[in-house]
Amino acid sequence: MSNCWCFIFCKERVRSNSSSPQHDGTSREEADHQVDVSDGIRLVPDKAEATMATASDEIMHQDIVPLCAADIQEQLKKRFAYLSGGRGQDGSPVITFPDYPAFSEIPDKEFQNVMTYLTSIPSLQDAGIGFILVIDRRQDKWTSVKASVLRIAASFPANLQLVLVLRPTGFFQRTLSDIAFKFNRDEFKMKVPVMMLSSVPELHGYIDKSQLTEDLGGTLDYCHSRWLCHRTAIESFALMVKQTAQMLQAFGTELAETELPNDVQSTSLVLSAHTEKKAKVKEDLQLALTEGNSILESLREPLAESIVHSVNQDQLDNQATVKRLLTQLNETEAAFDEFWAKHQQKLEQCLQLRHFEQGFREVKTALDSMSQKIAAFTDVGNSLAHVQHLLKDLTTFEEKSSVAVDKARALSLEGQQLIENRHYAVDSIHPKCEELQHLCDHFASEVTRRRDLLSKSLELHSLLETSMKWSDEGIFLLASQPVDKCQSQDGAEAALQEIEKFLETGAENKIQELNKIYKEYECILNQDLLEHVQKVFQKQESTEEMFHRRQASLKKLAAKQTRPVQPVAPRPEALTKSPSPSPGSWRSSENSSSEGNALRRGPYRRAKSEMSEPRQGRTSSTGEEEESLAILRRHVMNELLDTERAYVEELLCVLEGYAAEMDNPLMAHLISTGLQNKKNILFGNMEEIYHFHNRIFLRELESCIDCPELVGRCFLERMEEFQIYEKYCQNKPRSESLWRQCSDCPFFQECQKKLDHKLSLDSYLLKPVQRITKYQLLLKEMLKYSKHCEGAEDLQEALSSILGILKAVNDSMHLIAITGYDGNLGDLGKLLMQGSFSVWTDHKKGHTKVKELARFKPMQRHLFLHEKAVLFCKKREENGEGYEKAPSYSYKQSLNMTAVGITENVKGDTKKFEIWYNAREEVYIIQAPTPEIKAAWVNEIRKVLTSQLQACREASQHRALEQSHSLPLPTPASTSPTKGSTRNVKKLEDRKTDPLCLEGCVSSSLPKPPEKGKGWSKTSHSLEAPEEDGGWSSAEELINSSDAEEDGGVGPRKLVPGKYTVLMDGEKGGSDTLAMRSGDMVEVVEEGTEGLWYVRDLTSSKEGWVPASSLATLLGKSSSAQCLSSSGKTHCARQLCPEPAKILSPEPV
């Protein structure tokens, strides 16, 4: 127990020393970063300080005598010796040895343990006086008496003052003891002072009766079992106090050595762990105090039961010991509570500091990011609408940023509160509070500065807009004044009043001083805005100049009418300059003006109608017309920009109000099972469309606000990005089907309610489809007013491209509806055309019955023309709503385009054409709904076959060029082109696996062409394909009858008089050759040798020699059909000299 009390006295000494000067000089900085227990509890045991304990503290000596009642409880229960609590006259403790017949049989170890324990109970002061032993042997024999006395004297571990022996009471034994004691007196004196007593009264002469137990004739109340229970409880309590002290010591050391964590989570964990351990320590302290109070009550119980009960000294000592332990425990608890309060406060302040630091980092990052964004907002706008949009964005940005700013200001106030509460880290908190205040003020000032700049820009653009509006209204006024009415005095005066009245409004609407504008708006005038101001001012001056000219003219007219007008004959020049408008022309102007209704603005239609009237007597110049068209272009551009901005905002509204909410955990309970994880199906790639328009396309459109006629370039440069609409439209059927299944979902209703939308989500999902179709209408309007402008060609090309995208989107919607096709439709190349036709089939090797039935009963087929194949499908109508009602297409068959040929006209029917396969083994007669559709399909198929022909020619030429360098050319044996061709064909047939280009063969067998043919030598190609292509033949055949189709004759190309078209470019190779370009029309004059014809260019009238293979016949009226083929069993002549791929419409010679 010495450790426990050492800890207590250390605590008291620390308290007594806490006011020393050394303690007052302790560093405050060290106290800020570690737990200081110097003024609380020292839990480290110190043996030197243990000597400060009082001498009456029995518990301290348990380190010297480790025995306790619990260890020898069974030995003490034998009661062969006990400490009754009695005292001698000088205060010596009395140990009684009652009559115990088996005393001699007690083992020495047990006897030694009991003696050692009993002598350790009294205080050191009482034990120093010496013990009095009372040995009761009245019922024993002398021999036992002697043995007991000698054993006790030999083994007694403490000082002995007196040994009182009650000798045997029997006559014989008493007589024997007297005699024996007399003879052995010296032996007893040598060991201990022994007094042989004959009776109890004699014993009372040495020890007062009140200090003796009842069995010795005394009045001392002693119960051995009660004494043993009390001693066990007191020692157990002392041990509990010791363990509690050790636990406090370990816990205090742990707290003292704990470093303050650097983050919120770790600090919270440390605080929680320490609080939990502190609760456990407090529980153990309370348990010890409860145990001590219970023991004290037990010790006081005999006195409480009887007032006359006397308490011996041992009982008093026990009560004092327990009281002292309880007092020390209470003091220890109080000291620990004080120490814990400081430690807990330190940890709580540390946690507050970490929360503050974490919040500071987050807020500072947010404020820095917002400051960077506001610093990057340098755009002051290029139009009034743009500035208003920027101001709206700034307001939205400020509203979103207000959360971070409010959080920063609240955090700064929180830091000030910590400082006021005397936080230990004031030096760290105060600078951060100042920095937060500075960041908030800086951000607020930047927002204010930005708002002031935009307000200035808004003010300037309002002035510019007002000026432009004034100029536009002036131009409209000038354009709307009918010149014929101004010829009269009243009309001229009325027009003059309108002019003067309008000029009076200029003081309020026009820019007065340009220098003043420069000076007042210097802070926002960048190069673009400066140029815009100058343009507006120039336009204003130009308008004023036109008004002054009109005003001067009207004044002259009004002044001339004041004198009589002499009738004179009109001058011819005046008649030619100002013809009278005819009723037809007037109606024409009215009709043309009605075409401008796309913008749906009455004044614009009126201005356009007036401008389109005949120019009789009008004084407005071409510049005025251009200004009027420019105004119309500007209005189209404004409509394009306004609708584009609204479109972008609607997309953002859908993405934030619906798509993002599908990932919101708070809305998850509203989403039905059928809608979960299907956001991509419902919204498709709308987010991709939004980012394209918001980040790229809208900005590029805004850059064209001053030059609306150049907007076509924006569309052309971003035409590839517009392909994303095809993906969206392809997903639209799935999206609409999902919407119909889940349209009544509470999620959609809640989102619509939050957004305050009058229309449901499906209306907004249709916006991208509507928008892509809207562009072509706006481009048409812009093109109508920009026909003679710089960007007219770009507008036309952009319109064609947008229409192409719409067609591709429409075609792809049909394409995804094809069912039953085993292959990959993507491998067939780009989809070129699709449509429904009536189809008859005719097979060369089929049964006659099938042929005849096919003539009368057509099949309804939907054809899909790809670059590599044409697909025949059966259209099936579906029942349902929306996209579910769209038809599906069952795949029937397909034809490879490498083996397809066409016949343009069938039996004089303008709506029919043939597609035949494998040299007419299979023939399909196609009837289009209209001749125009037939022409479009024939042209598209012709383009595909021509491109295949060109690709084969290039490949053949490339192979010939490689082989001409590696193989020796044979010496020509004949000058006949036919024989040479036949010989070379045979050689090619002999070498199927390695075909040679015809150019090399023919050039080696034919005589050298004249000098004038050098420029056209590259046009003689072989069209023989690799073996796996199945003998790819010419893409064009000219036939006069069906018999000619199967004719096996071969020969060189014969001259047919008439006109021809040039298929490929040719440079001038000599003085007699003719340089031609593809598409030129020529007339054959003379047939030459070696494949050259002498022709005349019908355009330039120049003449010269050209290769016959580079010309295509323009036929006259004939019943023979024109066929275009890319495959089939072809003749040698066509293989040797392939015919051109492109056939134009027949033209008579």
From Swiss-Prot:
List of residues that carry Phosphothreonine: T622
Superkingdom as given in the UniProt entry: Eukaryota
Coiled-coil residue spans: 503-528
Keywords: Cell membrane, Coiled coil, Cytoplasm, Guanine-nucleotide releasing factor, Lipid-binding, Membrane, Phosphoprotein, Proto-oncogene, SH3 domain
Domain DH: 632-812
Quaternary structure note: Interacts with GTP-bound RAC1. Interacts with CDC42. Interacts with RHOA. Interacts with CCPG1, which results in specific inhibition of its exchange activity toward RHOA, but does not affect its activity on CDC42.
Organism: Rattus norvegicus (Rat)
Membrane topology summary: Peripheral membrane protein
Chain spans, region Disordered: 555-627, 956-1033
Gene Ontology MF term list: 1-phosphatidylinositol binding; guanyl-nucleotide exchange factor activity; phosphatidylinositol binding
PTM characteristics: Mainly phosphorylated on serine.
Biased composition (Basic and acidic residues): 607-616
Protein name, entry field: Guanine nucleotide exchange factor DBS
Domain SH3: 1055-1116
Composition skew (Low complexity), residue ranges: 583-594, 964-978
Family the entry assigns: Belongs to the MCF2 family.
Broad class of where this protein is predominantly found: cytoplasm
PROSITE patterns: CRAL_TRIO, DH_1, DH_2, PH_DOMAIN, SH3
Domain PH: residue ranges: 830-946
Cited function: Guanine nucleotide exchange factor that catalyzes guanine nucleotide exchange on RHOA and CDC42, and thereby contributes to the regulation of RHOA and CDC42 signaling pathways. Seems to lack activity with RAC1. Becomes activated and highly tumorigenic by truncation of the N-terminus.
Taxon lineage: Eukaryota, Metazoa, Chordata, Craniata, Vertebrata
